[in-house]
């Protein structure tokens, strides 16, 4: 009945819930990061990602629901229409700090997207299946790769 007044089918509802949940993870992690001082953008992004990973570890039901769809909370047009947030999200934070710190990234938004997709696709498998490594052993390798993506011009 009334379900179809808001969503065309159950998949649209699922996408909206996924995007909203993912958005909340990023919003909470960004709030935590804003309570600290970071000289480097890569340190701040790794802190945010680590916060999200730890929350996913602590909430296995949410992890199974989100699976590998972490970026939906950042790149979902449906969610943008539903949320009216005054706070800077990770996307805005990342782009602003790239400019402020004069980090020579040619496409900052694409770099952030690649970071989120990398995290999303690898962390689920590492937490749930412990492949290729258990998450605590995997994190240092992941964070090194994130730093390389952000500091690409320093290579």
Regions from the language model: what does each represent?
Residues 1-12, 16:
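Helix-turn-helix
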Residues 23, 27-30, 43, 55, ...:
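Amphipathic alpha-helical packing segments from all-alpha helical-bundle domains
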Residues 30-34, 66-75:
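Short linear capping/connector segments at secondary-structure termini
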Residues 98-145:
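Hydrophobic/aromatic-rich alpha-helical bundle segments in the mid-to-C-terminal region
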Residues 150-155:
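Generic C-terminal helix-cap and adjacent flexible tail
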């Amino acid at each position: 009945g009334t379900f179809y007044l808001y969503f065309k089918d159950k998949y649209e509802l699922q996408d909206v819930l996924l995007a909203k949940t993912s958005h909340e993870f990023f919003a909470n992690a960004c709030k935590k990061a804003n309570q600290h001082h970071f000289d480097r953008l890569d340190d701040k992004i790794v802190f945010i990602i680590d916060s999200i990973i730890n929350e996913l570890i602590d909430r296995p039901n949410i992890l199974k629901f989100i699976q590998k769809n972490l970026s939906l909370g950042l790149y979902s047009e449906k969610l943008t229409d539903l949320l009216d947030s005054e706070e800077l999200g990770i996307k805005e934070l990342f782009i602003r700090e790239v400019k402020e710190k004069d980090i020579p990234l040619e496409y900052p938004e694409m770099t952030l997207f690649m970071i989120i997709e990398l995290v999303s696709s690898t962390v689920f498998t590492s937490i749930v299946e412990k492949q290729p490594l258990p998450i605590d052993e995997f994190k240092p390798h992941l964070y090194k790769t994130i730093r390389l993506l952000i500091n690409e011009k320093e290579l």
